[in-house]
Amino acid sequence: MYEIVFDGGSLGNPGLGYGSYEVTSGGDVLQRVERQEYGQGVTNNQAEYRSLIGALAWLRQHLGDNASGATVVVNGDSQLVLNQVRGTWKVKNEGLRPFHCQARELANQFGSVTFTWHDRSNSVRRLGH
């Protein structure tokens, strides 16, 4: 089983977008991005999506042909992003639609993906912001 913790934000909303993520398996950290900057004009939700996409893309590449059998648990504090990728909520903002499609496309390449909300304090504890 693989676990992803992701978080993103924006200084200004929209403003300077940034994000981070951690990918673990069996308690071992496989990949950790502490701060990836996404440039100006980025909203909080776009930054959240970009962090999730970065983590899913990294894990997909890391696993290669084995991705289709992998179980992945994704944890984040963005209810909007998590509910949209689960299909529980519609994507009403056209600016988020490309990010949503990319995240779903990546998630569909794994055997099983569960999207779980956690409190912001868990993101801070794991990712440092």
Predicted features along the sequence, with ranges:
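RNase H-like nuclease fold core
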Residues: M1-Q46, A57-Q61
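Short, conserved alpha-helix that lines the donor NDP-sugar binding/gating region
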Residues: E48, L52
